[in-house]
């Protein structure tokens, strides 16, 4: 029957089954497409809502940004007005004072140059970390408010001697004084240059040195040689400079000297004429005497307090060692005391004359030995004065060399006898 083209119903049914299957798959595919479209629509809806949400957040952030910018412009205007106000306050003439101690974040205790202490307000723009006791500050002239912090050495006359300011005196320029040279170099110069020697031996180098002796014996000149031979910072101050009009200024100056020395360590402090502030303490009856004793106490405290590792050495010179306070002379403060004798032996006089004459133009017949062998009491300053006077006499006579007659006349002029000394006793 297949050959005749006749298909039976069973065979027809068999042939129709793939069509049914194709329709079912098509229907399923259509349903899947609908589901996919529905899911895609849901995704697009979620993205749309997220977009709207982000747009609202963006608008909110934009408003916040505009508000912050307005607030920033307002704060800048306020800051500018505040800076102008601070500048106006600091532009008027200010009073120099001293900061004593803080009370809280906004107030503190200061002392003015009049000697009075005040509880004052502290300008809010100042760095509280920089406010230390004994610092120099600027006070408002009307309210005494603390408006500025001055540099540490702004109102101090103490300064470190620069390299170009150091004296050109060397040890070779100091005639004689061989023992004094050795002692001061061991106590001052050697610890600064070769500190490891003292560490190996196990001893501490001397803290301070006292040079004492009559006037004109070479104390200051030897200190100049020390300053020239070392690279340490050199601070020179006279004892009378510590005495001020207002109470507290002298001790503060002592603290400033040692603070400056510690900041520039290794350093040497030279206090000349120390007897003006370091005399023996007594029951003072006047304010000035009590102030001098406060200066001495501060000096003793600083010499006890500064650390050995800072390499700060103290040299003091005086003509009256017998008047100094025993607390200053004890070991631990002034460990080495070097005496400068007024009477020089013949060898010392020869060295001094030779040192001074080496820089002068002497005639070949000039005989220094005739002056050296004399037994008059001659200090180094007197010998220098003799040679200077001889040079002046040669200049007076339009000569370029110094003759023996110039030396004799200068010697007679400078070396006074008992009769000529009475001429200077005006107040008898």
Swiss-Prot record:
GO term, biological process aspect, one: positive regulation of RNA polymerase II transcription preinitiation complex assembly
Describe how it is modified after translation. N-acetylated by NAT3.
First-listed, main subcellular location of the protein, grouped into a coarse class? cytoplasm
Fetch the Pfam families from UniProt: AAA, Prot_ATP_ID_OB_C
Q: Which GO terms describe its molecular function?
A: ATP binding; ATP hydrolysis activity; identical protein binding; proteasome-activating activity
Keywords associated with the record:
Acetylation, ATP-binding, Cytoplasm, Isopeptide bond, Nucleotide-binding, Nucleus, Proteasome, Ubl conjugation
Cross-link type Glycyl lysine isopeptide (Lys-Gly) (interchain with G-Cter in ubiquitin), residue numbers: 280
Q: For binding ATP, which residues are annotated in this chain's numbering?
A: 213-220
Q: What is the superkingdom listed in this entry's lineage? A: Eukaryota
Would I find RNA-binding among this entry's keywords?
A: no
Single GO cellular component term: proteasome complex
Q: Could you tell me which residues carry N-acetylmethionine?
A: 1
Where does the record say this protein resides? Answer: Cytoplasm; Nucleus
* Family as reported in the entry's similarity comment: Belongs to the AAA ATPase family.
Q: What does this protein do?
A: The 26S proteasome is involved in the ATP-dependent degradation of ubiquitinated proteins. The regulatory (or ATPase) complex confers ATP dependency and substrate specificity to the 26S complex.
Name of this chain's protein: 26S proteasome regulatory subunit 6B homolog
Q: Which organism is it from?
A: Saccharomyces cerevisiae (strain ATCC 204508 / S288c)
- Gene name of the encoded protein: RPT3
């Amino acid at each position: 029957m297949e050959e005749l083209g006749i298909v039976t119903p069973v065979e027809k049914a068999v042939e129709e089954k793939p069509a049914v299957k194709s329709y079912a798959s098509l229907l399923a595919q259509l349903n899947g497409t609908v589901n996919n479209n529905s899911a895609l629509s849901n995704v697009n809806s979620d993205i749309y809502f997220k977009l709207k949400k982000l747009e609202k957040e963006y608008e909110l952030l934009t408003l916040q940004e505009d508000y912050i910018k307005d607030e920033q412009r307002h704060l800048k205007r306020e800051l500018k007005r505040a800076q102008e106000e601070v500048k106006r306050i600091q532009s008027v003439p200010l009073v120099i004072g001293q900061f004593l101690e803080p009370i809280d974040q906004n107030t503190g205790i200061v002392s003015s140059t009049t000697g009075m202490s005040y509880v004052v307000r502290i300008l809010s723009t100042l760095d509280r970390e920089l406010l230390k006791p004994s610092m120099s500050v600027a006070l408002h002239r009307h309210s005494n408010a603390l408006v500025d912090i001055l540099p540490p050495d702004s109102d101090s006359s103490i300064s470190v001697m620069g390299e170009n300011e150091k004296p050109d005196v060397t040890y070779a320029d100091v005639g004689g004084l061989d023992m004094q040279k050795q002692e001061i170099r061991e106590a001052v110069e050697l610890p600064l240059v070769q500190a490891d020697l003292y560490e190996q031996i196990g001893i501490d180098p001397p803290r301070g040195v006292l040079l004492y002796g009559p006037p004109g014996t070479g104390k200051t000149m030897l200190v100049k040689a020390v300053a020239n031979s070392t690279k340490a910072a050199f601070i020179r101050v006279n004892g009378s400079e510590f005495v001020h009009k207002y109470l507290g200024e002298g001790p503060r100056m002592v603290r400033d000297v040692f603070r400056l020395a510690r900041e520039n360590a290794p350093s040497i402090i030279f206090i000349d004429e120390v007897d003006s502030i370091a005399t023996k303490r007594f029951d003072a009856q006047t304010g000035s005497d009590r102030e001098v004793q406060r200066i001495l106490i501060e000096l003793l405290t600083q010499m006890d307090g500064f650390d050995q590792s800072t390499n700060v050495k103290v040299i003091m010179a005086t003509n009256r060692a017998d008047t100094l306070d025993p607390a200053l002379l004890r070991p631990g403060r002034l460990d080495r005391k070097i005496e400068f004798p007024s009477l020089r032996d013949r060898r010392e006089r020869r060295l001094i004359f030779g040192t001074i004459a080496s820089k002068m133009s002497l005639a070949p017949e000039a005989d220094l030995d005739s002056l050296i062998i004399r037994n008059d009491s001659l200090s180094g300053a007197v010998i220098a004065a003799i040679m200077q006077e001889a040079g002046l006499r040669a200049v007076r006579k339009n000569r370029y060399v110094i003759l023996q007659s110039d030396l004799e006349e200068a010697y007679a002029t400078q070396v006074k006898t008992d009769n000529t000394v009475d001429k200077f006793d005006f107040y008898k």
